[in-house]
Amino acid sequence: MTNQRFKSTDPVNIEGWSWQPFLEDAIKRLEGLNVEPYPVPDRFLQREDQTGSKSKSIPVTTATWACKTEKFRQVRAACVSAGSAASVLNFVINPKSTYDLPFFGGDLVTLPAGHLLALDLQPAIKTDEVHTTHVWDRLIPIFERWRDQLPYGGPIPEEAQPFFSPGFLWTRLPLGEEGDELIQSIVRPAFNDYLDLYLELAASAERVTDERSEVLLQGQRKYTDYRAEKDPARGMLTRFHGSEWTEAYIHTVLFDL
């Protein structure tokens, strides 16, 4: 059973959704930041459909949790539950361009072939040392702590490399008991370590000049434009909810800068 939701900060409770503990961990860490609901149109707060065959349909729920704070333009969680077909949490923090911060990205995906899991503090301008050095100096030790405890997920496309840091933690895990154990014992604490570092960086961040803010904004737009164009969830969401809804969701909610 799912709950009816009226604003973007209303709780997401989807029966059987495997990533619920991760979302709850993240929301708890945002307490104390004076979060406000982020404007999300009603039709994207929660949608329910069916997938699969006529003889064996699978219920699908896609929900959006989102907020904004003093330093974060948008914090949002795209939550998808489709039984054995898919289970997804895409959790992203988009900072305001008035602060020299990266993006936080957590992508937790379960498909019939296995789990695809990625964590990063993604740079808006990877070649800008002022933007990256203070982040990477603290991120790399956390990355190294967890990297050797997880299988490597494989190389990322060259065109995507400007949007990932050297601390990009990326793995593929099998379905079943082995993968579930690694998710609980390694991936969940790694997710929280990455998020804790991000929130520490944000807490100490000070406003930048208008000129610097404009430079950061251009970098952020390149990132969001790329993500909107290449969103790997597009095919899945289109299959579940149709093309019109999916394109509107990608461009007006997920990557709306």
From Swiss-Prot:
<keyword id="KW-0560">Oxidoreductase</keyword>
<dbReference type="GO" id="GO:0050618">
    <property type="term" value="F:phycoerythrobilin:ferredoxin oxidoreductase activity"/>
</dbReference>
<dbReference type="InterPro" id="IPR022827">
    <property type="entry name" value="Phycoerythrobilin_Fdx_Rdtase"/>
</dbReference>
<comment type="similarity">
    <text>Belongs to the HY2 family.</text>
</comment>
<dbReference type="Pfam" id="PF05996">
    <property type="entry name" value="Fe_bilin_red"/>
</dbReference>
<dbReference type="InterPro" id="IPR009249">
    <property type="entry name" value="Ferredoxin-dep_bilin_Rdtase"/>
</dbReference>
<protein>
    <recommendedName>
        <fullName>Phycoerythrobilin:ferredoxin oxidoreductase</fullName>
        <ecNumber>1.3.7.3</ecNumber>
    </recommendedName>
</protein>
<dbReference type="GO" id="GO:0010024">
    <property type="term" value="P:phytochromobilin biosynthetic process"/>
</dbReference>
<dbReference type="GO" id="GO:0050897">
    <property type="term" value="F:cobalt ion binding"/>
</dbReference>
<comment type="function">
    <text>Catalyzes the two-electron reduction of the C2 and C3(1) diene system of 15,16-dihydrobiliverdin.</text>
</comment>
